[in-house]
Amino acid sequence: MLTRKQYELLRFINERLKESGVPPSFDEMKDALDLRSKSGIHRLITALEERGFIRRLPNRARAIEVIKLPEVAGNGGGRRGFTPSVIEGNLGKVRPSGGGVVDDAERPVAVPVMGRIAAGTPIEALQTRSHTISVPPDMLGSGEHYALEVRGDSMVEAGILDGDMALIQRNETAETGDIVVALIDDEEATLKRFRRRGASIALEPANTAYEVRILPPNRVQIQGKLIGIYRKY
C-alpha cells in the first residue's frame, strides 16, 4: 500500500523516465510534490525502494529504476492485484463553472450508501439505504452501483482502508482476482479477493494477519465487484 505522496512521486519518476530516459533530480521531485526540503524526498524514495517499486542503482548519480507500478482496476477488476482508484471527498462536488452549463455526462452521479462491509471478520451487511455520495460518472461505467462503508483492515495491502467507501458494481458472478462483496450463508458480508480452488471458493484477504477462507460454492453469493474507493481526507 502506498501513501498519496509515495504514489505521486512514483508516477512522476515513471513519467519522466518515459519522456527522457533520465530520472528527475531531487530538486525536480521536491518541486513536483511541493515539498519544502529534499529530506522528504529521501524518505519517500526509501519507502518506495523498501516496498519494491523502485531500485536505486549503485555508483551512479540520479540512477533510479522503476520496477513495478500499482495496478489500477478498471471496470472489470484487477486480475493479479488491485490498487483502487481513489476519489477525494470533495471531488464529487460540482466545480464552479463561471455561469456555464455543466454537461450531463460530467455531472456527479448520486450513489446510494447501503451500509457497512467488513474488511476483516465478516459482519452483517446493512441493506437499508442511508444516504448517497456523489461520484464522477467516468468512475462507474455501465450497470447498477452502490457503496458500502469499509470496516476493518484485512484489505489494507490492496489499498483499501478502514472507513473508506467501497464503490460496488452489482454483479452475481466474478472472475478469479476480482475483489468482491461476498455474502456468506445468507447472513454475513465481507469484502475479499475471489478465487476458485478446485470445486471450492477462496476468499482471500490482503493482509497477512488474516487467513484465507475456503468455502463450498453453495455458501457464497456474489453481490458485486469493487470498482473504486471513495475516501475523505
Swiss-Prot record:
Family annotation (InterPro entries): LexA, LexA-like, LexA/Signal_pep-like_sf, LexA_DNA-bd_dom, LexA_repressor, Peptidase_S24_LexA, Peptidase_S24_S26A/B/C, WH-like_DNA-bd_sf
Keywords: Autocatalytic cleavage, DNA damage, DNA repair, DNA replication, DNA-binding, Hydrolase, Repressor, SOS response, Transcription, Transcription regulation
Record-level Gene Ontology MF annotations: DNA binding; serine-type endopeptidase activity
Active-site residues, record numbering mapped to chain: S154, K192
Site (Cleavage): A119, G120
Described purpose of this protein according to its UniProt entry: Represses a number of genes involved in the response to DNA damage (SOS response), including recA and lexA. In the presence of single-stranded DNA, RecA interacts with LexA causing an autocatalytic cleavage which disrupts the DNA-binding part of LexA, leading to derepression of the SOS regulon and eventually DNA repair.
Family classification: Belongs to the peptidase S24 family.
PANTHER family xrefs: LEXA REPRESSOR, LEXA REPRESSOR-RELATED
Name of the featured protein: LexA repressor
Species of provenance: Nitrobacter hamburgensis (strain DSM 10229 / NCIMB 13809 / X14)
Gene that specifies this protein: lexA
